[in-house]
A protein has these predicted regions:
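Conserved binding/catalytic microenvironments
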Residues: 97-100, 104-108, 112-420
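Conserved hydrophobic/aromatic packing and binding residues within compact polymer-binding modules
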Residues: 12, 23-27, 37-40, 67
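Short coil turns linking two alpha-helices in DNA-binding domains
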Residues: 22, 33-36, 49, 63
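A short, Lys/Arg-rich alpha-helix, primarily the initiator
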Residues: 1-19
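Short C-terminal boundary/hinge segments that cap the last helix of small helical domains
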Residues: 61-76, 313
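DNA major-groove recognition helix of helix-turn-helix/homeodomain DNA-binding modules
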Residues: 31, 51-66
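Recognition helix of helix-turn-helix/homeodomain-like DNA-binding domains
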Residues: 31-47, 69-73
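Short, charged recognition helix plus adjacent turn
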Residues: 69-97
Length: 420
């Protein structure tokens, strides 16, 4: 089924879920009944007035053409070329002459750096060729990485369905390799969360984390090596995963610290999924568990490109707070996090994405100037995060509606093709 074939009511429902709104919340903002929203989403009531569609689009922060299933015009700064990635994912014929493995590894490494520096336009152009090459090389490790990069970019560009396809391909290629499967599960969880499928994301993320983390990282097994979280953590390991563990026999296996970083990332993604399900207590427990894993990492080679560590945990805590509606706590945590030394070491993509989330938190508390500062800071760190992502565009639109618009936002609105 193409986008044009999807009933308008289902598109309304999909965007409502993406905006983390219940039917009652949408009804309240439209000043209509919950029953009216339910009938629209089920197709029991026809949306045949453009003025009503415009009103819905305004509340859902999308263009009316999106709800109508019509082709959107591409605003300035938006990355195009996704069709080339779609075509590469649709290929089932194997290229006859893939590059040597060393050359492919170099290309994959370059693609990761391009993503982490938020050069999304460049990455869109690189990915079709990289996918074709990786699909012909039969290197599971490199193909999983190529699919993960692709999925991460597609989720950024609001192509979550296609992102999920790429993540699912990564999972299939990983096969029985627990570490590769765990890295692929990160992308699966991200794509499902972007689709509003938080329960499914949680179901995929937690088993994957448990397969790569030692039993001592779970709160039910604290007798092995102490209490994680904000209390006493196990003794730090070195980069080989070695350390003084007292010879305890309750571990699943200490493994490599790179695997622990993958497991910690899975826990953070699971915490965000739990928050999306409304399970705030579980989200806090999962972030505490991830904090314990992070505290046990002295330093590691981030081969799997997770950016996991204590600062990543604090970023997740802020987002969990925002998701449960406590924007004030989210902003307090953000203020503390950006003063930590590790903040500047996070990739530009990571920091830019967080600042967009921070801008949304400022909007929740009615601080338009704070939201504007966060957007301008994000643009200075990772311009494509602000200028290419549909999510950022909706935040800019919300801030730009102020009269007069805060400093810097009018310029951003113009850059992304918005008019006040």
């Amino acid at each position: 089924m193409t986008s044009d074939d999807i009933p308008i009511g289902r598109r309304v429902a999909n965007w409502r879920v993406r905006r983390s709104m219940t039917q009652q919340m949408l009804a309240d903002r439209l000043r209509r009944s919950k029953s009216w929203v339910d009938k629209i989403e089920r197709g029991a009531r026809t949306l045949d007035r453009y003025s009503v569609i415009q009103e819905l689009a305004h509340v859902l922060r999308v263009d009316p053409e999106v709800l109508l299933g019509q082709q959107r015009s591409t605003p300035a700064g938006t990355t195009d070329g996704v069709d080339g990635i779609r075509a590469a994912l649709a290929r089932y014929d194997i290229p006859q002459a893939p590059p040597p493995t060393d050359e492919l590894r170099r290309q994959v490494g370059h693609a990761w750096l391009t993503y982490q520096h938020a050069h999304y336009g460049q990455l869109v152009r690189l990915l079709p060729g990289l996918l074709n090459a990786a699909q012909g090389a039969w290197s599971a490790e490199l193909l999983v990485q190529a699919y993960r990069i692709t999925s991460s970019l597609l989720v950024k560009l609001d192509e979550a369905d296609l992102g999920w396809l790429s993540a699912d391909r990564a999972m299939a290629v990983a096969g029985g390799d627990p570490v590769l499967a765990a890295t692929a599960a990160i992308s699966v969880g991200q794509a499902l969360r972007a689709q509003g499928q938080d329960h499914l994301a949680l179901a995929a993320l937690l088993p994957a984390a448990d397969r790569v983390l030692p039993l001592s990282s779970h709160p039910d097994d604290q007798e092995v090596s102490g209490t994680f979280g904000d209390q006493t953590a196990p003794k730090p390991l070195d980069h080989r995963g070695e350390g003084d563990h007292g010879g305890g026999g309750g571990h699943r296996g200490q493994g490599d610290l790179r695997e622990w970083a993958v497991g910690g990332t899975l826990l953070l993604q699971a915490a965000l999924a739990a928050a999306g399900c409304g399970e705030s207590r579980r989200a806090d427990e999962l972030t505490d568990r991830a904090a314990g894993v992070a505290a046990n990492l002295r330093g590691y080679d981030d081969q799997h490109h997770t950016s996991f560590g204590p600062v990543a945990v604090e970023v997740a805590r802020a987002l969990v707070a925002a998701q449960r509606g406590d924007a004030a706590e989210a902003l307090r945590r953000h203020s503390t996090t950006v003063r930590r030394e590790g903040w500047q070491r996070l990739p530009a993509e990571y920091r830019g994405a967080h600042l967009i989330d921070v801008a949304r938190a400022y909007l929740q508390v009615g601080d338009l100037r704070g939201a504007a500062r966060a957007l301008v800071d994000a643009d200075s760190i990772a311009p494509a995060e602000v200028r290419c992502r549909p999510l950022a565009r909706t935040v800019i639109a919300d801030v730009a509606r102020a009269q007069p618009a805060p400093a810097g936002v009018a310029r951003l609105a113009t850059l992304v093709g918005l008019t006040r």
